[in-house]
UniProtKB/Swiss-Prot annotation:
Protein's UniProt name: UDP-N-acetylenolpyruvoylglucosamine reductase
Chain's role: Cell wall formation.
Cofactor(s) recorded in Swiss-Prot or TrEMBL: FAD
Pfam families xref list: FAD_binding_4, MurB_C
Biological process per Gene Ontology, one example term: regulation of cell shape
Catalytic residues (UniProt): 164, 238, 334
Gene: murB
PROSITE patterns xref list: FAD_PCMH
Length: 339
């Protein structure tokens, strides 16, 4: 049945939070989605689109309709001397796409290995890791407007990408459902090894040649060492964004805290590592009942088993208040909080 009622969501979010959706649909095609949206009895419902459930926190049950996008398929649209264009369904697992590209020799997303979630969520969040952002390989996407049923194509400019952000998280939030994404990948790789511990790990791995496979292997190793596997410990990866502040404020913080890591950006701003701010505020390894902060990565809030969404959210708010008090910096959640 295309529309189900009172469906448990615990297995559909990587936090492993027990919550229930009033209505739920697993959507495997564009035609199926259009048919469902034509049901007038569903028009007034709150709607939530999910993919892998890896960037979401249910603080309570969802009294609306959860639309679970599962449109699959990877199609090569074309190529020239330098690039390959791929058309990818929103329901394709992101890491599976990365592995597919590595196997084919398509470069550009190897630094984004092992990021959980689906392709349809990647442009919403403008996912990024280890010096690379999704927007760098993005060409366009097709999305269905919920209110009209019309399909619109968005180019890079229309998506208004910024750090872990896009128009689909701001002015168009909840108005469109992404169906397919087109990526422009490179035939000749430009290796990004200057971020994090990639160079150090590559040196220990000693690959015969530097390749996109070697970069991916290094990133996978780093992520597996630092981040808990949600199959065993519930989490949504990085809970907070790295805050961006103006350089004047960064200078004040540097004067007060000489060891604070500051990454100067080209636009007159600076980025601070949220993990450092959280750790310096004393939260690393914190645990209260079933909820806590990961021992190795302070950016990750974890559910050790049986935690409620309210308990996770309460901890997140306490961390925000603590960092704001200590550093006069407000951390912004990267996770989509449903309350």
């Amino acid at each position: 049945m295309d529309l189900q009622e009172n469906i448990p969501l615990q297995s559909l979010n990587t936090f492993g939070i027990a919550a229930t959706a009033r209505y739920y649909s697993l959507v495997k095609s564009q035609a199926m989605l259009k048919q469902l949206l034509n049901n007038s009895s569903l028009h007034s419902l709150l709607k939530l689109t999910i993919g892998g459930g890896s960037n979401i926190l249910f603080v309570k049950d969802f009294d609306g309709w959860v639309i679970h996008m599962d449109i699959k398929g990877i199609e090569k649209l074309g190529e020239d001397n330098n690039h390959i264009w791929l058309h990818v369904g929103a329901g394709v697992n992101w890491h599976s796409l990365v592995l597919y590209c590595i196997e084919k020799g398509y470069a550009g997303i190897e630094n984004l290995s092992l990021i959980p979630g689906t392709v349809g969520a990647a442009p919403i969040q403008n996912i990024g890791a280890y010096g690379v952002e999704f927007s760098e390989v993005f060409e366009s996407l097709e999305a269905l407007e919920i209110s009209t049923g019309l399909i619109k194509k968005f180019n890079k400019e229309a998506c208004a990408f910024s750090y872990r952000d896009s128009i689909f998280k701001s002015s168009l939030k909840g108005q469109y459902i992404i169906l397919q994404v087109t990526l422009r990948l490179n035939k000749q790789p430009t290796f990004q090894t200057n971020y994090g511990a990639i160079q150090e790990v590559l040196a220990s791995m000693k690959p015969r040649t530097l390749s996109i496979k070697a970069i991916s292997d290094a990133v996978i190793y780093i992520r597996q060492q630092k981040l808990p596997n949600p199959a065993y410990i519930g989490n949504a990866g990085s809970f907070f964004k790295n805050p961006i502040i103006d350089q004047a404020k960064a200078t004040l913080l540097r004067n007060k805290y000489p060891n604070i890591p500051v990454h100067i950006l080209a636009n007159g701003y600076a980025k601070l590592p949220a993990a450092w701010l959280i750790e310096q505020s004393g939260w690393k390894g914190y645990r209260h009942d079933a909820v806590g902060v990961h021992l190795h990565q302070p950016l990750v809030i974890v559910n050790y088993g049986g935690a409620t969404g309210k308990a996770v959210y309460k901890l997140a708010q306490a961390i925000q208040a603590s960092v704001a008090e200590n550093f006069s910096v407000m951390l912004e959640p990267e996770v989509n909080i449903i309350q």
